[in-house]
């Protein structure tokens, strides 16, 4: 039988079996020799904090941000609709913490932008809203369908 040994001065805070060292940022791009890099640019993110990044309205209250996978925040938005709409556009480029629930096309698509902005303002404080928009190619109309279970 094995003898039990007590070590009162030894503290195991992170055993190697469960401790995983934090990795630095992954390499961005590794090209084989037969490829030629045509552009390699690093640019800081937008620093505008007084306008919504989606609808460009003035932010008169505390803005909402997109939460990233690593716990950071990106962007400044006036509503969850604006936040989720932009998040659905950038989710293939930005690692998001959660899947966006709303997806609208950029305002440049709409002839009557004020109608879209009025919808955003009307539903700004509503919880549980989800949905999307649908482009009807034959009639060149965009149907916005937002719903709630609450």
UniProtKB/Swiss-Prot annotation:
InterPro entries: Poxvirus_VLTF2 (IPR004975), Znf_MYM (IPR010507). One of its GO terms (molecular function) is zinc ion binding. GO terms for biological process: DNA-templated viral transcription. It comes from the Viruses. The keyword Chaperone does not apply. Pfam families: Pox_TAA1 (PF03295), zf-FCS (PF06467). Acts with RNA polymerase to initiate transcription from late gene promoters. Interacts with itself. Interacts with the late transcription factors VLTF-1/OPG093. Belongs to the orthopoxvirus VLTF-2/OPG126 family. This is Viral late gene transcription factor 2. The gene is OPG126.
């Amino acid at each position: 039988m094995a003898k039990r040994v007590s070590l009162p001065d030894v503290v195991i805070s992170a055993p190697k079996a469960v401790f995983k060292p934090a990795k630095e940022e992954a390499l961005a791009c590794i090209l084989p020799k037969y490829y030629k890099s045509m552009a390699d640019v690093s640019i800081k993110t937008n620093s505008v904090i007084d306008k919504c990044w989606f609808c460009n309205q003035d932010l008169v209250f505390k803005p909402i941000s997109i939460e990233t996978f690593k716990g950071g925040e990106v962007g400044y938005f006036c509503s969850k609709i604006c936040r989720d709409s932009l998040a659905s556009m950038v989710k293939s480029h930005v690692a998001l913490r959660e899947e966006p629930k709303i997806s609208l096309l950029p305002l440049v698509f709409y002839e009557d932008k004020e109608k879209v902005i009025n919808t955003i303002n009307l539903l700004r404080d509503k919880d549980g809203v989800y949905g999307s928009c649908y482009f009807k190619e034959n009639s060149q109309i965009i149907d916005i369908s937002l719903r709630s279970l609450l």
